[in-house]
Amino acid sequence: MDDHNLDYKGSGALEELEMLTVNAKEAQELILTKILERNQATEYLSKFMNGSTNISAFKRHVPVVTYDKVHPYILRIATGEESSILCGEYILELLRSSGTSRGEPRLMPSILKDLDRRTYLYSLIMPIMNKYISGLGEGKAMYLLFVKAETLTDSGIPVRSVLTSYYKSPHFLHRKHDLYNNYTSPDEVILCPDSQQSMYCQLLCGLVERQHVLRIGAVFASAFLRSISFLEQHWRDLVNDIRIGQLNSSITSPACRLAMLNFLALPNPELADQVEAICSCGSWKGILGRLWPNVKYIEAVLTGTMAQYIPMLEFYGGGAIPFVCTMYASSESYFGVNLSPLCSPADVSYTILPNMAYFEFIPLEDGLRLTDHEEVIENDKLVSLVDVKVGCYYELVVTTFSGLYRYRVGDVLQVTGFYNRAPQFKFICRRNVILSIDSDKTNEEDLHNSVTTAKKILENQNYLLLEYTSYTDISTVPGHYVLFWEIKSTHDERPAPLDAQLLESCCAAVEESLDYVYRRCRAHDRSIGPLEIRLVEAGAFDALMDLLVSHGSSINQYKTPRCIESSLALKLLNSKVIACFFSPQDPECGM
């Protein structure tokens, strides 16, 4: 990583990637050695290593930990103690995780060199894409990118999301505007902390540049679809701005208004007529290809529970625009890239880059039987990066330069193969998103698979499931699972009635698809009541996102929580319920 910028490096980047993956074992040993050398004097490592930088000693003595063990050190730094209690370098900022998997945001330490590592990974994306799609340098990218307002700790350390950190960094703002980093959105609009004003302006830029746009997307599919939903609601205002050459008065950000002058220098009634004709045609099926006729692909994270959004993307894309998932990253570290970006989202595997951090893996020996959040993991159970086995499931553990040592990220991965000596992983689920009433334990993937089975019943009746989440309602005896569903018609003509029998059959289908323990508790032990679907009004999940973003989540990193833990979020969703349906029968339990 000698050249830490976003300049397009072409085949040179791929040659470097080849060398890196061929020498994955050596790269990992070098990374860990450097981490130990730079951080050997920290209070945290000194407790276990006594100043040693020996790799074997690290593996014997440094424990595997969850956030609860790291949090006290981060709080001490946040309130004014030296970074050296955790990290040998100055902690530049604390990165706020999305906070939607466990309720409260987690704060991850970050140092200046972390930006180099993130930029290195970003610099690989376009060389990889150019292997599969030609002509990407001949147009622009409409990437809908957002920042979140940051806060300061008592000691003055910025607290921000990892993406806000990157978009505000010199690495992004001082990038050379070459052919492959040519975005429709001005930086000033991306950096607007008001996501509604930013979204409006970014969509307006994309419409003005519609003939030049070759790539569209956002970080997560949820953010992209939220933007398209926003476009459905506001296209008339956007068309009017284009027609008269003036920005809507609702945009009050001075930076946004100044940046948009170049896009609305003159009235453009011809373009306004084109966009109006497309947006007013009735059905929005396939509208992305009509609004941006030269688009070659949609880029967003569509793995894990983001796969929920594929049907809606297919609806808006008309089934004609490929989906691309390019990278795997989190607030803790950036991890890897997808070397086969045009594969089906269901087949996406990420090649771990061995120069990002030091990676270890907790084997999940019983398939997806997840280790308990508080379970003590014996050090000798961990497997190194190059020693994982194809087909096996693991929980990811990282050691970083910035002060995370053998930290359980919480992601469950399955090894799908190797690229040279670097393993390739499929993202399966987050460890701690579960529903449980009795002896049942339903994880995120179990829930996703069950909902996927049930939603086919809706699709056969010309409905799409837009969003869902869940919680365990123990106000009843026995307690039961509750699913909140938001549904949209996909048919130009009048769809089949959305009656009780249809939703009850969905309840039954979810239950039949859940595991044996759940079905036994329901049908035999009677320790779980019938599953309930609460249908919510249109826009309920947008309101949920607004609530969670207002409480610290980043709009870029936001993912709909698949299990609601916040009482405020639960109250909001219950206020949006328009009908309730229960499973009409016991599931089969084979007893």
Curated annotation (Swiss-Prot):
Coiled coil: none annotated. InterPro entries: GH3 (IPR004993), GH3_C (IPR055378), GH3_M (IPR055377). One of its GO terms (molecular function) is acid-amino acid ligase activity. This is Probable indole-3-acetic acid-amido synthetase GH3.11. One of its GO terms (biological process) is response to auxin. Expressed in etiolated and green seedlings, roots, callus and highly in flowers. Belongs to the IAA-amido conjugating enzyme family. The lineage of its organism: Eukaryota, Viridiplantae, Streptophyta, Embryophyta, Tracheophyta. Induction: At low level by auxin. Keywords: Ligase. GO terms for cellular component: cytoplasm. It holds the Pfam family GH3. May catalyze the synthesis of indole-3-acetic acid (IAA)-amino acid conjugates, providing a mechanism for the plant to cope with the presence of excess auxin. Its EC number is 6.3.2.-.
